Amino acid sequence: ANSVKGEISFNTHKLYDGGTNSPFTRLTNALNKIRKGQKLSFEEEYAIESFYHEILHTKTKGWELLRPHGWGDFKRTAMETVNQFVSRHEYSKFIERLGGTARHEKSVLKDGTGYKKWVERFREVIRKAKIDENEAYKHFEDKLINGKYGDLEQEVYEYFKNKAGLKVSETEFYQALEGDQTKWDNIIKTVS
């Protein structure tokens, strides 16, 4: 997690999925393996990606404290979705800067658990509209780093409205992104 002061904290408790290591243990194991030139497991590589997600929060120029989910807007939903999407595309470069090599990029992008449903649905719009995912990544990376967090809600909607032909309101889009599968299925049908 990331605080308003830019401090990053780590969960030292075991994972809910029955995993034997905490996220902190997986991260420290990954860093030690990179230092020793050893290959990372998927879980260790994903721990680096999760850490990089938090680093991205500190890199943004337009960082602002947003209201929690469910408080009448979707600013945090948009920001976390974009941050996670960008992080999954960029974390391998971070591993390289640390001296390691990412080997699970496709799996991390597809099977990462952070904001899983939102990122899957975000990528589904990209695929269905036949938008080049690398182009979308570059577009949103720039907006994330150089724009304001609070502007991402409208930025994501306008991007998909223009590039994917969304025919629903911004509120309907975000309610479906966060909501149940039936709502989402109805939204994705409008993508062209």
Regions found by a protein language model. Name each.
Residues 71-117:
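Post-HExxH zinc-binding segment in Zn-dependent metallohydrolases
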